[in-house]
Amino acid sequence: MPKVGMQPIRRQQLIQATLTAVDQVGMGDASIALIARLAGVSNGIISHYFQDKNGLIAATMRHLMNALIQNVRERRQALTEDSPRAHLQVIIEGNFDASQVSGPAMKTWLAFWATSMHHPSLHRLQRINDHRLYSNLCCQFRRTLPLEQARNAARGLAALIDGLWLRGALSGDAFDTEQAQRIAYEYMDFQLAKSAS
């Protein structure tokens, strides 16, 4: 009989083991057996909590997405001003937070993006994540720009964030988050300046 209260601990343990496995060997070779071994549990525990590897991958991605949401939320709560610029900055900072740019997180995101094209449940998660970023950006740009300009600015900044993140992930060097943020801020300021003209 399972111990009371172990489910959240086991789930988190398996998610961390998944991040480690993907970091070490990639998504394709991150087998149930390897993940279970890294977590120090039997293979059957993964089936018990997640049904299969795709269920575990989905849970791992929800974990990373929730960390992103929480990072942005905490930064918003710490804001001392309510300007669109301030809100856009915290969205940018959250996307380049250490929780999103660590080696295991970056490799898991990359593998997830590739895998999501072939698995409907993972594709759904990817669409939710994309839509959340776009709608949050658009909401802030809309405070100062006409609707179509706000939509285009949001699309552009979302693409820039993803592109900077992707280049950083694939570079093989340490991710220069300050440089990535600076580039994103320049684009943001360029778009916000359109409201003054």
Swiss-Prot record:
GO terms for molecular function: DNA-binding transcription factor activity; transcription cis-regulatory region binding. Residues 8-68 form the HTH tetR-type domain. GO terms for biological process: glycine betaine biosynthetic process from choline; negative regulation of DNA-templated transcription. Pathway: Amine and polyamine biosynthesis; betaine biosynthesis via choline pathway [regulation]. Repressor involved in the biosynthesis of the osmoprotectant glycine betaine. It represses transcription of the choline transporter BetT and the genes of BetAB involved in the synthesis of glycine betaine. It comes from the Bacteria. Keywords: DNA-binding, Repressor, Transcription, Transcription regulation. PANTHER family: HTH-TYPE TRANSCRIPTIONAL REGULATOR BETI, HTH-TYPE TRANSCRIPTIONAL REGULATOR RUTR. This is HTH-type transcriptional regulator BetI. InterPro entries: BetI_C, DNA-bd_HTH_TetR-type_CS, Homeodomain-like_sf, HTH-type_TetR-like_transc_reg, HTH_TetR, Tet_transcr_reg_TetR-rel_C_sf, Tscrpt_rep_BetI. Residues 31-50 bind DNA. NCBIfam families: betaine_BetI, PRK00767.1. SUPFAM superfamilies: Homeodomain-like (SSF46689), Tetracyclin repressor-like, C-terminal domain (SSF48498).
